[in-house]
Amino acid sequence: MPLTMTITNSLMYIIPILIAVAFLTLMERKMLGYMQLRKGPNITGPYGLLQPIADGLKLFTKEPIRPLNTSPILLILSPMLALTTALLIWTPIPMPHALTNLNLGLLSTLAISSMAVNSTLWAGWAPNSKYALIGSLRAVAQTISYEVTLGIILLSTLMLTGGFTMQLLTTTQKHTWLLTTSWPLAMMWFISTLAETNRAPFDLTEGESELVSGFNVEYAGGPFALFFLAEYTNIISMNLLTCILFINPGPTQHPELFLTNLIIKTMILSMSFLWIRASYPRFRYDQLMHLLWKQFLPLTMALCLLHTSLSISISGIPPLS
Protein backbone atom coordinates (compact mmCIF):
# COMPACT_ATOMS: atom_id res chain seq x y z
CA MET A 1 0.00 0.00 0.00
CA PRO A 2 2.71 2.61 0.82
CA LEU A 3 4.44 1.79 -2.50
CA THR A 4 1.15 2.28 -4.39
CA MET A 5 0.59 5.63 -2.67
CA THR A 6 4.14 6.74 -3.50
CA ILE A 7 3.70 5.86 -7.19
CA THR A 8 0.26 7.55 -7.28
CA ASN A 9 1.61 10.73 -5.64
CA SER A 10 4.51 10.85 -8.09
CA LEU A 11 2.20 10.42 -11.09
CA MET A 12 -0.22 13.05 -9.77
CA TYR A 13 2.78 15.38 -9.55
CA ILE A 14 4.33 14.57 -12.94
CA ILE A 15 1.25 14.42 -15.24
CA PRO A 16 0.09 18.05 -14.63
CA ILE A 17 3.68 19.23 -15.26
CA LEU A 18 3.80 17.45 -18.63
CA ILE A 19 0.35 18.82 -19.58
CA ALA A 20 1.52 22.34 -18.64
CA VAL A 21 4.65 21.85 -20.78
CA ALA A 22 2.53 20.74 -23.76
CA PHE A 23 0.36 23.85 -23.57
CA LEU A 24 3.38 26.11 -23.00
CA THR A 25 4.54 25.14 -26.50
CA LEU A 26 1.11 26.13 -27.85
CA MET A 27 1.26 29.44 -25.95
CA GLU A 28 4.72 30.11 -27.38
CA ARG A 29 3.58 29.51 -30.95
CA LYS A 30 0.45 31.63 -30.45
CA MET A 31 2.40 34.51 -28.84
CA LEU A 32 5.11 34.49 -31.51
CA GLY A 33 2.37 34.39 -34.15
CA TYR A 34 0.52 37.42 -32.79
CA MET A 35 3.79 39.33 -32.34
CA GLN A 36 4.53 38.69 -36.04
CA LEU A 37 0.98 39.70 -37.08
CA ARG A 38 -0.26 36.17 -37.85
CA LYS A 39 -2.55 33.68 -36.14
CA GLY A 40 -0.32 30.77 -35.13
CA PRO A 41 -1.81 27.22 -34.89
CA ASN A 42 -5.59 27.42 -35.43
CA ILE A 43 -6.55 24.30 -37.42
CA THR A 44 -6.23 21.33 -35.03
CA GLY A 45 -9.21 21.50 -32.67
CA PRO A 46 -11.01 24.68 -31.55
CA TYR A 47 -8.58 27.65 -31.75
CA GLY A 48 -5.73 25.14 -32.24
CA LEU A 49 -6.02 23.79 -28.67
CA LEU A 50 -5.37 20.19 -29.75
CA GLN A 51 -2.12 21.09 -31.55
CA PRO A 52 0.22 19.92 -28.69
CA ILE A 53 -1.55 16.52 -28.56
CA ALA A 54 -1.24 16.15 -32.35
CA ASP A 55 2.46 17.11 -32.22
CA GLY A 56 3.12 14.62 -29.41
CA LEU A 57 1.35 11.78 -31.25
CA LYS A 58 3.26 12.55 -34.44
CA LEU A 59 6.66 12.62 -32.69
CA PHE A 60 6.16 9.47 -30.61
CA THR A 61 4.81 7.43 -33.56
CA LYS A 62 7.72 8.35 -35.85
CA GLU A 63 10.55 5.85 -36.27
CA PRO A 64 13.61 6.87 -34.21
CA ILE A 65 16.49 6.94 -36.71
CA ARG A 66 19.85 5.76 -35.37
CA PRO A 67 22.86 6.74 -37.50
CA LEU A 68 25.75 4.33 -37.99
CA ASN A 69 28.85 4.44 -35.72
CA THR A 70 26.90 5.79 -32.76
CA SER A 71 26.97 4.81 -29.10
CA PRO A 72 23.49 3.22 -28.80
CA ILE A 73 23.30 3.11 -24.98
CA LEU A 74 24.16 6.80 -24.54
CA LEU A 75 21.93 7.71 -27.49
CA ILE A 76 18.92 6.24 -25.63
CA LEU A 77 19.96 7.22 -22.09
CA SER A 78 20.69 10.92 -22.69
CA PRO A 79 17.11 12.07 -23.55
CA MET A 80 15.74 9.92 -20.71
CA LEU A 81 18.21 11.45 -18.24
CA ALA A 82 17.39 14.97 -19.50
CA LEU A 83 13.67 14.57 -18.76
CA THR A 84 14.27 12.71 -15.47
CA THR A 85 16.51 15.46 -14.07
CA ALA A 86 14.08 18.15 -15.31
CA LEU A 87 11.23 16.44 -13.38
CA LEU A 88 13.35 15.71 -10.28
CA ILE A 89 13.89 19.45 -9.74
CA TRP A 90 10.18 19.73 -8.84
CA THR A 91 10.32 17.35 -5.83
CA PRO A 92 11.40 19.88 -3.12
CA ILE A 93 9.28 22.76 -4.50
CA PRO A 94 6.37 23.64 -2.14
CA MET A 95 2.99 23.94 -3.90
CA PRO A 96 2.15 24.57 -0.98
CA HIS A 97 3.39 21.15 0.24
CA ALA A 98 6.46 19.59 -1.34
CA LEU A 99 6.57 16.00 -2.59
CA THR A 100 9.69 15.51 -0.42
CA ASN A 101 10.32 18.15 2.23
CA LEU A 102 14.13 18.32 2.25
CA ASN A 103 16.19 20.24 4.81
CA LEU A 104 18.53 21.41 2.03
CA GLY A 105 15.82 21.98 -0.59
CA LEU A 106 17.51 24.84 -2.46
CA LEU A 107 20.90 23.11 -2.58
CA SER A 108 19.32 19.88 -3.84
CA THR A 109 17.55 21.83 -6.61
CA LEU A 110 20.87 23.36 -7.70
CA ALA A 111 22.61 19.95 -7.57
CA ILE A 112 19.90 18.24 -9.65
CA SER A 113 19.91 21.03 -12.26
CA SER A 114 23.70 20.71 -12.62
CA MET A 115 23.24 16.98 -13.37
CA ALA A 116 21.41 17.92 -16.58
CA VAL A 117 24.82 18.92 -18.04
CA ASN A 118 25.68 15.19 -18.31
CA SER A 119 22.72 14.49 -20.59
CA THR A 120 23.71 17.41 -22.86
CA LEU A 121 27.30 16.17 -23.11
CA TRP A 122 26.21 12.58 -23.80
CA ALA A 123 23.70 13.75 -26.42
CA GLY A 124 26.45 15.58 -28.31
CA TRP A 125 29.02 12.79 -28.05
CA ALA A 126 26.81 9.71 -28.69
CA PRO A 127 25.74 10.42 -32.34
CA ASN A 128 29.41 10.70 -33.48
CA SER A 129 28.68 13.96 -35.31
CA LYS A 130 30.98 16.99 -35.16
CA TYR A 131 28.09 19.47 -35.30
CA ALA A 132 26.32 17.80 -32.37
CA LEU A 133 29.58 17.68 -30.39
CA ILE A 134 30.36 21.38 -30.93
CA GLY A 135 26.77 22.27 -30.00
CA SER A 136 26.94 20.21 -26.81
CA LEU A 137 30.32 21.72 -25.81
CA ARG A 138 28.83 25.20 -26.23
CA ALA A 139 25.77 24.24 -24.19
CA VAL A 140 27.85 22.67 -21.40
CA ALA A 141 30.20 25.69 -21.18
CA GLN A 142 27.22 28.06 -21.07
CA THR A 143 25.30 26.02 -18.48
CA ILE A 144 28.26 25.49 -16.15
CA SER A 145 29.25 29.17 -16.38
CA TYR A 146 25.82 30.52 -15.47
CA GLU A 147 25.37 27.96 -12.68
CA VAL A 148 28.16 29.80 -10.84
CA THR A 149 26.10 33.01 -10.62
CA LEU A 150 22.91 31.08 -9.83
CA GLY A 151 24.69 29.41 -6.90
CA ILE A 152 26.04 32.70 -5.53
CA ILE A 153 22.63 34.41 -5.87
CA LEU A 154 21.02 31.48 -4.01
CA LEU A 155 23.67 31.84 -1.29
CA SER A 156 22.91 35.56 -0.99
CA THR A 157 19.17 34.94 -0.55
CA LEU A 158 19.93 32.22 2.01
CA MET A 159 21.88 34.81 4.02
CA LEU A 160 18.70 36.90 4.17
CA THR A 161 16.37 34.02 5.05
CA GLY A 162 18.68 32.09 7.39
CA GLY A 163 17.89 28.57 6.15
CA PHE A 164 17.95 26.19 3.17
CA THR A 165 14.29 25.10 3.11
CA MET A 166 11.84 26.60 0.63
CA GLN A 167 9.13 26.87 3.30
CA LEU A 168 11.40 29.32 5.14
CA LEU A 169 11.46 31.53 2.03
CA THR A 170 7.65 31.63 2.18
CA THR A 171 7.74 32.70 5.84
CA THR A 172 10.44 35.34 5.20
CA GLN A 173 8.33 37.00 2.49
CA LYS A 174 5.19 37.21 4.62
CA HIS A 175 5.25 41.03 4.75
CA THR A 176 7.42 42.03 1.78
CA TRP A 177 8.91 40.32 -1.27
CA LEU A 178 12.65 39.79 -1.50
CA LEU A 179 12.35 41.43 -4.93
CA THR A 180 11.92 44.84 -3.27
CA THR A 181 15.02 44.50 -1.06
CA SER A 182 17.35 42.68 -3.45
CA TRP A 183 16.20 43.65 -6.95
CA PRO A 184 19.75 43.59 -8.48
CA LEU A 185 20.00 39.92 -7.48
CA ALA A 186 16.54 39.23 -8.93
CA MET A 187 17.48 40.92 -12.22
CA MET A 188 20.72 38.91 -12.55
CA TRP A 189 18.92 35.71 -11.49
CA PHE A 190 16.28 36.18 -14.23
CA ILE A 191 18.90 36.78 -16.95
CA SER A 192 20.94 33.81 -15.69
CA THR A 193 17.88 31.54 -15.85
CA LEU A 194 17.44 32.57 -19.50
CA ALA A 195 21.03 31.48 -20.18
CA GLU A 196 20.71 28.34 -18.03
CA THR A 197 17.69 27.11 -20.01
CA ASN A 198 19.34 27.98 -23.38
CA ARG A 199 16.58 30.42 -24.33
CA ALA A 200 16.80 33.48 -26.58
CA PRO A 201 18.82 35.70 -26.63
CA PHE A 202 21.25 33.06 -25.28
CA ASP A 203 20.21 30.16 -27.55
CA LEU A 204 23.69 29.81 -29.03
CA THR A 205 23.44 26.02 -29.02
CA GLU A 206 20.85 26.32 -31.79
CA GLY A 207 22.65 28.73 -34.13
CA GLU A 208 21.06 27.28 -37.29
CA SER A 209 23.56 28.89 -39.66
CA GLU A 210 26.47 27.27 -37.81
CA LEU A 211 25.36 24.09 -36.02
CA VAL A 212 22.11 23.09 -37.80
CA SER A 213 20.19 22.45 -34.54
CA GLY A 214 22.77 22.11 -31.77
CA PHE A 215 23.42 18.97 -29.73
CA ASN A 216 20.11 17.28 -30.68
CA VAL A 217 20.68 17.47 -34.45
CA GLU A 218 20.81 13.65 -34.88
CA TYR A 219 17.70 12.98 -32.78
CA ALA A 220 14.25 12.42 -34.29
CA GLY A 221 10.86 11.19 -33.13
CA GLY A 222 10.51 10.10 -29.48
CA PRO A 223 14.05 10.95 -28.23
CA PHE A 224 13.78 14.45 -29.73
CA ALA A 225 10.40 14.88 -28.02
CA LEU A 226 11.99 13.95 -24.67
CA PHE A 227 14.65 16.67 -25.11
CA PHE A 228 11.91 19.11 -26.08
CA LEU A 229 9.86 18.23 -22.98
CA ALA A 230 12.96 18.53 -20.76
CA GLU A 231 13.76 22.02 -22.10
CA TYR A 232 10.26 23.38 -21.47
CA THR A 233 10.01 21.63 -18.08
CA ASN A 234 13.21 23.42 -17.10
CA ILE A 235 11.72 26.75 -18.20
CA ILE A 236 8.64 26.30 -15.99
CA SER A 237 10.67 25.01 -13.01
CA MET A 238 13.14 27.92 -13.22
CA ASN A 239 10.29 30.43 -13.34
CA LEU A 240 8.63 28.68 -10.39
CA LEU A 241 11.91 28.90 -8.47
CA THR A 242 12.11 32.62 -9.33
CA CYS A 243 8.62 33.10 -7.85
CA ILE A 244 9.53 31.24 -4.65
CA LEU A 245 12.81 33.14 -4.23
CA PHE A 246 11.71 36.69 -4.98
CA ILE A 247 7.91 37.06 -5.31
CA ASN A 248 6.59 34.37 -2.99
CA PRO A 249 2.83 34.46 -2.26
CA GLY A 250 3.47 34.11 1.49
CA PRO A 251 1.77 31.81 4.01
CA THR A 252 -1.99 32.22 3.48
CA GLN A 253 -4.84 30.46 5.29
CA HIS A 254 -6.05 28.80 2.07
CA PRO A 255 -3.55 26.47 0.33
CA GLU A 256 -5.51 26.61 -2.95
CA LEU A 257 -4.98 30.41 -3.09
CA PHE A 258 -1.24 29.87 -2.57
CA LEU A 259 -1.10 27.50 -5.55
CA THR A 260 -3.25 29.76 -7.76
CA ASN A 261 -1.06 32.75 -6.91
CA LEU A 262 2.10 30.78 -7.68
CA ILE A 263 0.73 29.47 -11.00
CA ILE A 264 -0.33 32.96 -12.19
CA LYS A 265 3.09 34.45 -11.38
CA THR A 266 4.87 31.53 -13.08
CA MET A 267 2.69 32.00 -16.18
CA ILE A 268 3.56 35.71 -16.33
CA LEU A 269 7.29 34.93 -16.06
CA SER A 270 7.01 32.20 -18.73
CA MET A 271 5.24 34.67 -21.04
CA SER A 272 8.07 37.14 -20.47
CA PHE A 273 10.52 34.41 -21.62
CA LEU A 274 8.53 34.12 -24.86
CA TRP A 275 8.28 37.91 -25.21
CA ILE A 276 12.08 38.18 -24.90
CA ARG A 277 12.46 35.53 -27.62
CA ALA A 278 10.30 37.56 -29.99
CA SER A 279 12.04 40.86 -29.21
CA TYR A 280 15.82 40.40 -28.94
CA PRO A 281 18.48 39.11 -31.35
CA ARG A 282 20.94 36.39 -30.35
CA PHE A 283 24.09 37.32 -28.42
CA ARG A 284 27.54 36.55 -29.76
CA TYR A 285 29.37 33.87 -27.77
CA ASP A 286 32.06 36.26 -26.51
CA GLN A 287 29.35 38.72 -25.36
CA LEU A 288 27.63 35.89 -23.48
CA MET A 289 30.80 34.96 -21.58
CA HIS A 290 31.78 38.60 -21.03
CA LEU A 291 28.38 39.30 -19.46
CA LEU A 292 28.88 36.50 -16.95
CA TRP A 293 32.57 36.53 -16.02
CA LYS A 294 33.22 40.29 -16.25
CA GLN A 295 29.89 41.72 -15.02
CA PHE A 296 27.59 39.28 -13.22
CA LEU A 297 30.20 37.33 -11.25
CA PRO A 298 31.92 40.33 -9.55
CA LEU A 299 28.52 41.92 -8.80
CA THR A 300 27.01 38.78 -7.29
CA MET A 301 30.12 38.13 -5.17
CA ALA A 302 30.07 41.72 -3.87
CA LEU A 303 26.34 41.47 -3.02
CA CYS A 304 26.89 38.10 -1.32
CA LEU A 305 29.60 39.65 0.89
CA LEU A 306 27.32 42.62 1.60
CA HIS A 307 24.42 40.38 2.67
CA THR A 308 26.72 38.28 4.87
CA SER A 309 28.33 41.28 6.58
CA LEU A 310 24.98 43.10 6.90
CA SER A 311 23.29 40.25 8.77
CA ILE A 312 26.29 39.84 11.11
CA SER A 313 26.60 43.58 11.81
CA ILE A 314 22.86 44.01 12.44
CA SER A 315 22.83 41.06 14.87
CA GLY A 316 25.61 42.82 16.84
CA ILE A 317 23.53 46.00 17.38
CA PRO A 318 22.03 46.06 20.90
CA PRO A 319 18.20 46.28 21.19
CA LEU A 320 16.71 49.78 21.41
CA SER A 321 14.36 49.07 24.31
Swiss-Prot record:
Pfam families, per the entry: NADHdh
Bilayer disposition of the protein: Multi-pass membrane protein
GO MF, any single term: NADH dehydrogenase (ubiquinone) activity
Transmembrane regions: 7-27, 73-93, 104-124, 148-168, 175-195, 227-247, 256-276, 297-317
Main location (coarse class): mitochondrion
Keyword Mitochondrion: yes
Residues forming coiled coils: none
EC number of the protein: 7.1.1.2
Entry's Gene Ontology cellular component terms: mitochondrial inner membrane
Subcellular location(s) per record: Mitochondrion inner membrane
Listed GO biological process terms: aerobic respiration
Catalytic activity: a ubiquinone + NADH + 5 H(+)(in) = a ubiquinol + NAD(+) + 4 H(+)(out)
Keyword field: Electron transport, Membrane, Mitochondrion, Mitochondrion inner membrane, NAD, Respiratory chain, Translocase, Transmembrane, Transmembrane helix, Transport, Ubiquinone
Keyword Transmembrane helix applies: yes
Function of the protein: Core subunit of the mitochondrial membrane respiratory chain NADH dehydrogenase (Complex I) that is believed to belong to the minimal assembly required for catalysis. Complex I functions in the transfer of electrons from NADH to the respiratory chain. The immediate electron acceptor for the enzyme is believed to be ubiquinone.
Family: Belongs to the complex I subunit 1 family.
Protein name: NADH-ubiquinone oxidoreductase chain 1
